[in-house]
Amino acid sequence: MRFTKMHGLGNDYIYVNCFEETVENPSEVAKKVSDRHFGIGSDGLVLIMPSERADFKMRMFNSDGSEAEMCGNAIRCVGKYVFDRGMTNKNVIRVETLAGIKVLELTVQDGKAKLVKVDMGEPILKPENIPVNSDKEIFRTEPVEIDGKEFKVTCVSMGNPHAVSYVKNVDIFPLEKIGPKMEHHPLFPKRINAEFVEVIDRTTLKMRVWERGAGETLACGTGACAVLVASVLNGVSERKATVKLLGGDLIIEWNENNNHVYMTGPAVKVFEGEVDLNEL
């Protein structure tokens, strides 16, 4: 199987061009190739496929083999992959995901895609659609107890579910302890991605993320979008802000006119290779 390793802010995936390759049982393949000791090493596997509804289709699998609806960092790399390889010459690309069709706008330098702006669509705030076990109109600054400590949580879906809470110092926050307990909290029937945020100022937010099925990662694009939306709802941020993640910065904007959230950030190719899956 031929592959390309790429990352968006250190959120790294193995990309396979399914116009040329067939991947049987992608869930198992994801587990094998993601292993950082016995495989290639990544946060998951992304398949780039033909689509009947858009220019391309993306399927993505976490390192534990579970299929995810959408990943902002991964989809930016899909945009770079198809443009740099000449699979399209368009600067605006439509990509089908399990969370709907996403529109990508590429900034091209020297014939290569450098920055990708993604229309992430409208945030979902109704608890039943996130899903959260709550009959509230929106789940904003609601108390969630973990280990006897109360967190004020705001929930947003960007095609996948997020629980956002605020902390004084995100660098020393015990994420590896609290993150998995938030992910598996009974309030969240499909588990949840947990973001912990420090507000630097009204246009700068600093976050760490515990991703459902992957643990702490260097960056999560949908998580950064959810953080911006939650921060606007909570009155602590402007509608456009820089979100600082461990792997780097994303610029997130929640447009007032069309209610869409836009994410702009880099996409980087690391290397290409070939792997015999029977040997893993």
Swiss-Prot record:
GO BP of this protein: lysine biosynthetic process via diaminopimelate
Primary localization class, coarse: cytoplasm
GO molecular function, one term: diaminopimelate epimerase activity
Signal peptide: none
Pathway in which this enzyme or protein is active: Amino-acid biosynthesis; L-lysine biosynthesis via DAP pathway; DL-2,6-diaminopimelate from LL-2,6-diaminopimelate: step 1/1
Record keywords, A-Z: Amino-acid biosynthesis, Cytoplasm, Isomerase, Lysine biosynthesis
Positions of substrate binding: N11, N62, G72, N73, N160, N193, E211, R212, G221, T222
Source domain of life: Bacteria
Site, as annotated: Could be important to modulate the pK values of the two catalytic cysteine residues: H162, E211
Subcellular location: Cytoplasm
Record GO cellular component, one term: cytosol
Cytoplasm recorded as keyword: yes
This enzyme's EC code(s): 5.1.1.7
EC category name: isomerase
Residues at the catalytic site: C71 (proton donor), C220 (proton acceptor)
Catalyzed reactions per annotation: (2S,6S)-2,6-diaminopimelate = meso-2,6-diaminopimelate
Biological role stated in the UniProt entry: Catalyzes the stereoinversion of LL-2,6-diaminopimelate (L,L-DAP) to meso-diaminopimelate (meso-DAP), a precursor of L-lysine and an essential component of the bacterial peptidoglycan.
Family: Belongs to the diaminopimelate epimerase family.
PANTHER family, A to Z: DIAMINOPIMELATE EPIMERASE, DIAMINOPIMELATE EPIMERASE, CHLOROPLASTIC
Subunit structure: Homodimer.
Protein's name according to its UniProt entry: Diaminopimelate epimerase
